[in-house]
Regions:
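Short, conserved micro-motifs composed of acidic
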Residues: 264, 358-394
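Surface-exposed loop/turn segments and immediately adjacent short secondary-structure elements
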Residues: 1-146, 156, 160, 386
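Extended C-terminal regions of large enzymes
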Residues: 466, 479-646, 650, 831-835
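Conserved catalytic palm subdomain of right-hand nucleotidyl-transferase polymerases, strongest
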Residues: 86-95, 133, 143-153, 194-238, ...
Length: 850
C-alpha cells in the first residue's frame, strides 16, 4: 500500500516520515474553523488611497506600459500543461495533472475558452474557481484552528487558466524589470533563497573581515498571504503598467475566489461550508505568489530610495543595499541605527497603509560595530512596532539558516546532519521497496544537505564521514551487505547499481551548478556581481577545480543543468570503471561485458522493478560480488590477513569442489534436484506456462498453478490447444532428450511451440542456449517427420542465476506467441523469479552446517 501511495502522493508519505504533519487526533470543530478563517478572509479591507508614498510610486515606478493584447494560444497552453505535476493533490474535481497531460485533443478548444475569459467575452464558471483548501497542522496542538496552514488545491482547469495568466504577467515583469533585484521570488532564472543567502553571506563576511558597522532587522509578516487587500492587488498591477486586459481578467478571478476547508483527522474528518475570499491570495497557486510579490514590490522600490549599507572596500563603496526580500521574509540593512529607524518608518507606514501587520514575537534586530556584535537591551520602537534585540548568544533563523552576525556553521551543520540521518533511518526502515527507498533517499533525505552546500563551508572529510555513516545505517537496517561494494551503491540502476546519490557527489554537482548560476546571474544583478567577486576564492574556485579534475568544459555560458548532467555522467563512468576493475566484486560485471551476445541493457532492467525488497536486493548484489560467507571466501580472507588458513574449502555438501559462490548457486550436484529445480527453474517455467495461457485467453489461466506445482507431468486442454507440462514425447527413433519443459499444441492453427527453461551461471548463459538448441534438435526433427502438417518452433528460455540474458531471448519469446509490447515486462518478471530463487538457494545452503 505504501509503495502504491508513493507513486500517487509522495508529499504525504514524506510528511508522515518527517513526523511534523502527522494525522491529528483531536481536530477543531467545524464551527470554530469557520469562525476563525471567515474572520480572516471574509472581512474585507482596503488600502489607504491617500498615502503619501503612492504619488511617488505613480511618478517613478514603471514607465513602460504593455501595448499588445495577450492571447491564449494552444502553444501557450501546451507550455503550461507540461509544468503540471502528475499526482499533485487535486481540487474539487478530484482530477490530477496526469490525465490532462495525456489528453491532447481538448487543448485547442480549451485555449479558445480561456482566451474568451481573458478578453471578457465569457464569464469564468464558479465551479472552475472554487478551491479545496487542506488545513495542515503546524504543530502537535491541533485542536486550535489557528495552528493550521491552509494549502489551496484548485481544479486542474483553474490551474491551467491561472498558469496562462501567470505566464503573461511574468513576461511583462521580466521585459520591464518590474521586480527589484532585492526580491528573489517570482522571477525566472533566480535561485530564490540561495541567491539571498549568498548575498547575505557576502555582507556578513565583509562586515567581519573589514570591521565594518552594521545594523540589521529581521521582520516577519503575520499571515501575509491572507492579509493583502484585493483592491491593492489590482492597484499594484496598474502601477506596474500591466495591460488592462490582464488586470481585468485577474480582477474577475480574485473577486470570485471561494473555498471549502477540510481537515483529515485520524478518527474523523471535517469539511466547512463555502468561504469567500474578500482579501488575501491562495497558498499553493503559482499566480498568487507573483501577485503577492507585486503587492509588496513597491515597498522594495521605496526602500531603494533610502540609504542603507554600502558594500565594497573603502574606495569603492558604490553599491547600496537596504534590504533583501524573499516573498514575505524581509531583512533590512543599514550602517547605523539612525538609518535603520528611517527604513523601519518606510516599512511600517507602507505595511499599515495596505493593511498588513507584523508578528512582533518573530521580529528582531542586531547591531555590530567594527565587525563585532554590540549588546543591545532596549527594544526598537517605530510607529507602534516594537522589536527586541537579538541576544549575544542567540541566533535568528533566516531562510532556514541560523545566523547572527554570521552563519553559525557548527550549529547549522549539526542540525541538517541530524535531520538527514533521521530521514535516512525512516526511509530505510520503512516498508518501501528497494526502488522506492532509493527515490525517497535521493529526493527526501539528500536535499536537506544540498540546501546548505555553497552557503555553509563543508570540508571533504565531513562529507565523506556522512557518506560512511549513511552506509552503516543501511547495513544496520539490513539493506546493504556489510562488505557490499561502495562504488556500486552509487552507480545508476541502469548500470547495475543501487542508484543512491552520494553526499560527496551531490556537493560537487551543487558547486558546479552554483558556479554557472553565479556567473550568469552577475550579468544582470549587481548584487550577484559582488557575490561573483566575493566567491572567486570560494565556491567558484572549488567548482573550477572540480571541472578540471573531471575534464569538463568550464565555459560559463553553459546552462547549470547541462553542466550538471555532463558532470554526473563523468562521475558515474568513473565509478563504473572502478567497480569493474575490482578483482572479486567486479568479476561478474567484467566478464559479462566481454560477451557480445549478452543483452546488457535488458539484463539490468530487472533493477527497475518497483516491488523488489531492499533486503533481497542487497543480498543478490552480495552474491554477484562473491561476498556471502562461503568457505572459499573465509579461507581467502584468512590468507589476506596473514593468518594460518588451515580451513578446508571443499563444498560442505558434495565434498568434491571448492565452495565458492558459483558452486553454491548453480554447481552443486547435491543441490540440483532438491533446490535448483523447484526454487528457480520450476518457478520460471510455471510463470511462462501461465502467461502463455493468459496470452491465448484461456479461462482460468492461473487456476492450476498450485496443482501444477505438485505434478511431475501434466496436460491441460483449452479449446483447440493442449498445454503439456514436462511430458515426454514419443518418437519413431530413440531420442535421449525428449522431455522439454513446456509444449503448446494448437491443433487449429497447426502449430507447436516447445519451450525449454534453464537458469545456469550467468557466464554460461550463451553456452547453455547453444547447448539446448543442439540437444533438442534431434527431437524437433523427429517430431517434424511424425507430424508433417504442423509447424514447430523451439524456444530456449535461458536466464542467468542473477538475471543476465542473451539478445536472442526477445526473439524466442516473440516466436512462441507473446506480444511484442509485453515481452520486456515478461523478461523482467522471469529475471526477478530467477534472482529470487538464487537468493533462496544461497540462504538455504548457508544454513547447512560446515
Amino acid at each position: 500500500e505504501i509503495n502504491r501511495k508513493l507513486t500517487r502522493d509522495q508529499k504525504s508519505i514524506y510528511r508522515g516520515m518527517h513526523g511534523k504533519h502527522s494525522t491529528p487526533k483531536n481536530i477543531p470543530t467545524k464551527e470554530s474553523v469557520e469562525l476563525f478563517w471567515k474572520g480572516i478572509w471574509e472581512q474585507k479591507s482596503n488600502f489607504n488611497k491617500e498615502s503619501t508614498w503612492l504619488q511617488e510610486l505613480q511618478a517613478k515606478y514603471c514607465h513602460q506600459a504593455q501595448q499588445t493584447k495577450y492571447r491564449v494560444s494552444p502553444e501557450v497552453l501546451d507550455k503550461v500543461t507540461t509544468k503540471l505535476q502528475n499526482n499533485k493533490a487535486p481540487g474539487p474535481d478530484l482530477l490530477t495533472g496526469y490525465w490532462y497531460k495525456r489528453l491532447s485533443f481538448y487543448r485547442n478548444h480549451l485555449a479558445t475558452i480561456f482566451d474568451e475569459c481573458l478578453n471578457g467575452d465569457a464569464e469564468i464558471p464558479d465551479w472552475l474557481i472554487a478551491a479545496r483548501t487542506k488545513l495542515i497542522p503546524k504543530n502537535s496542538d491541533a485542536h486550535l484552528p489557528n495552528n493550521y496552514r491552509p494549502i489551496a488545491c484548485q481544479n486542474i482547469m483553474c490551474k491551467l487558466y491561472t498558469g496562462c495568466l501567470n505566464t503573461f504577467l511574468q513576461d511583462h515583469c521580466q521585459s520591464n524589470q518590474i521586480v527589484t533585484h532585492e526580491q528573489a521570488a517570482g522571477k525566472r532564472g533566480h535561485w530564490g533563497c540561495i541567491d539571498q543567502l549568498l548575498i547575505n553571506k557576502m555582507i556578513q563576511d565583509e562586515v567581519i573581515s573589514k570591521r565594518r558597522d552594521l545594523a540589521c532587522v529581521w521582520l516577519d509578516y503575520q499571515k501575509a498571504f491572507d492579509s493583502v487587500p484585493h483592491d491593492w492587488l489590482i492597484e499594484s498591477l496598474r502601477l506596474a503598467k500591466v495591460h488592462p486586459q490582464l488586470v481585468q481578467a485577474i480582477h474577475a478571478l480574485t473577486k470570485n475566489w471561494t473555498t471549502r476547508l477540510s481537515i483529515d483527522g485520524s478518527d474523523q474528518k471535517m469539511e466547512s461550508d463555502l468561504i469567500h475570499y474578500n482579501k488575501g491570495v491562495l497558498q499553493g497557486d503559482s499566480l498568487s505568489v507573483l501577485l503577492f510579490v507585486l503587492a509588496v514590490n513597491p515597498l522594495s522600490f521605496l526602500l531603494k530610495q533610502r540609504k542603507g549599507y554600502f558594500m565594497g572596500s573603502a574606495n569603492e563603496r558604490n553599491l547600496d543595499i537596504t534590504h533583501l526580500f524573499f516573498v514575505d521574509d524581509l531583512k533590512l540593512y543599514s550602517s547605523n541605527i539612525d538609518q535603520m529607524t528611517h527604513l523601519l518608518d518606510v516599512v511600517t507606514t507602507f505595511s499599515k497603509d495596505i493593511g498588513m501587520e507584523f508578528g512582533q514575537s518573530k521580529c528582531s534586530y542586531m547591531i555590530a560595530k567594527r565587525g563585532k556584535i554590540v549588546e543591545a537591551k532596549d527594544p526598537l520602537e517605530v510607529n507602534g512596532l516594537r522589536i527586541y534585540p537579538l541576544g549575544l548568544n542567540d541566533n535568528y533563523r533566516y531562510l532556514g539558516i541560523d545566523e547572527a552576525l554570521s552563519y553559525n556553521g557548527p550549529l547549522n551543520k549539526g542540525k541538517v546532519a541530524t535531520e538527514y540521518y533521521k530521514r535516512v533511518r525512516k526511509i530505510w526502515s520503512s516498508e518501501l521497496s528497494a526502488y522506492n527507498k532509493m527515490i525517497a533517499h535521493n529526493s527526501f533525505a539528500i536535499p536537506v544537505l544540498v540546501y546548505t552546500f555553497g552557503v555553509l563551508t563543508w570540508s571533504i572529510s565531513e562529507l565523506d564521514e556522512i557518506d560512511v555513516k549513511t552506509r552503516k545505517l543501511l547495513t544496520l537496517t539490513g539493506n546493504l551487505h556489510r562488505n557490499g561494494d561502495v562504488d556500486r551503491i552509487y552507480m545508476p540502476r541502469s548500470e547495475g547499481g543501487r542508484g543512491l546519490k552520494s553526499v560527496r557527489t551531490a556537493f560537487d554537482i551543487r558547486l558546479i551548478s552554483l558556479r554557472q548560476h553565479i556567473i550568469q546571474a552577475s550579468d544582470a544583478n549587481p548584487f550577484m556581481r559582488k557575490v561573483h567577486q566575493h566567491e572567486g576564492s570560494g565556491v567558484i574556485r572549488i567548482a573550477e577545480e572540480l571541472l578540471t579534475s573531471l575534464d569538463l568544459n568550464a565555459d560559463p555560458a553553459i546552462a547549470p543543468l547541462e553542466c550538471c548532467k555532463s558532470a554526473v555522467k563523468v562521475i558515474h563512468k568513473k565509478r563504473e570503471s572502478s567497480f569493474i576493475s575490482k578483482v572479486m566484486h567486479g568479476y561478474l560485471a567484467r566478464e559479462m561485458r566481454k560477451k557480445p551476445e549478452i543483452d546488457f541493457k535488458t539484463s539490468l532492467s530487472c533493477w527497475s522493478n518497483r516491488k523488489m525488497s531492499s533486503h533481497f536486493e542487497g543480498y543478490i548484489q552480495a552474491i554477484q560480488e562473491q561476498e556471502i560467507g562461503t568457505k572459499y571466501l573465509i579461507r581467502k580472507r584468512l590468507i589476506q590477513s596473514g593468518k594460518e588458513a588451515n580451513i578446508d574449502d571443499k563444498c560442505r555438501l558434495c565434498r568434491k569442489h571448492t565452495e565458492d559462490v558459483s558452486h553454491v548457486i548453480a554447481g552443486c550436484e547435491r543441490m540440483a534436484t532438491r533446490f535448483y529445480l523447484p526454487l528457480r527453474h520450476d518457478e520460471v517455467a510455471r510463470f511462462l506456462w501461465n502467461r502463455l495461457r493468459k496470452t491465448h485467453h484461456a479461462e482460468g489461466a492461473f487456476e492450476n498453478n498450485e496443482y501444477l506445482c505438485e505434478q511431475k507431468e501434466f496436460i491441460d486442454t483449452c479449446e483447440s490447444r493442449e498445454y503439456w507440462w514436462n511430458i515426454p514425447v514419443k518418437t519413431c527413433t530413440k531420442v535421449k532428450h525428449n522431455r522439454p519443459d513446456i509444449i503448446v499444441w494448437d491443433h487449429k492453427a497447426k502449430t507447436c511451440f516447445i519451450l525449454e527453461v534453464a537458469c545456469p551461471l550467468d557466464v554460461n548463459v550463451s553456452l547453455k542456449e547453444t547447448e539446448k538448441e543442439n540437444i533438442y534438435g534431434q527431437l524437433i526433427r523427429n517430431m517434424q517427420m511424425m507430424y508433417t502438417e504442423y509447424t514447430f518452433t523451439f524456444a530456449p528460455i535461458i536466464v542467468g542465476a542473477s538475471g543476465y540474458v542473451t539478445s536472442n531471448l526477445k526473439q524466442h519469446l516473440n516466436n512462441v506467441g507473446f506480444e511484442t509490447k509485453s515481452i520486456p515486462s515478461i523478461i523482467r518478471q522471469i529475471q526477478v523469479l530467477a534472482i529470487s530463487g538464487t537468493v533462496k538457494i544461497a540462504k538455504t545452503f548457508m544454513k547447512f552446517k560446515s
